[in-house]
Amino acid sequence: MIGRLNHVAIAVPDLQAASAQYEHTLGAVVGPPQDEPDHGVTVVFIELPNTKIELLYPLGDDSPIKGFLEKNPSGGIHHICYEVEDILAARDRLKEQGARVLGSVEPKIGAHGKPVLFLHPKDFNGCLIELEQV
């Protein structure tokens, strides 16, 4: 069901500093900041030859990343994202097997302009999973 690893998301306390580190220290191709108000984050994508890194920074007081950074002030890996061909079929199959979908269970449009869902980390060995339709 899951396909390619789309990205690894890292919550950061300083988006500008983290972007500069990836660009200047690691020599990666770093995109511009992009506000995603429906998800309460500002994101920056870093293009790698085989996948992407998504830097996450809180957008607004209700941002889920704000709480993550309060618990992890230095930042850290927040979630991993896998591609799926049919997000509704994937959701239904996972729910039948007992997996919990976070939020309203209906896909939202993600930072790439495609439908996404998040799966509860308690159902996946402590890892928050994002599914993105390709």
Where are these regions (language model features)?
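A cross-kingdom feature marking solvent-exposed beta-strand/loop segments within repeated
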Residues: 4-6, 19, 23-38, 61-72, ...
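A contiguous binding-surface segment within folded domains or other stable secondary-structure elements
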Residues: 49-66
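Active-site segment of metal-dependent pyrophosphate-handling enzymes
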Residues: 40-42
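Vicinal oxygen chelate
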Residues: 5-13, 44-47, 54, 67-134
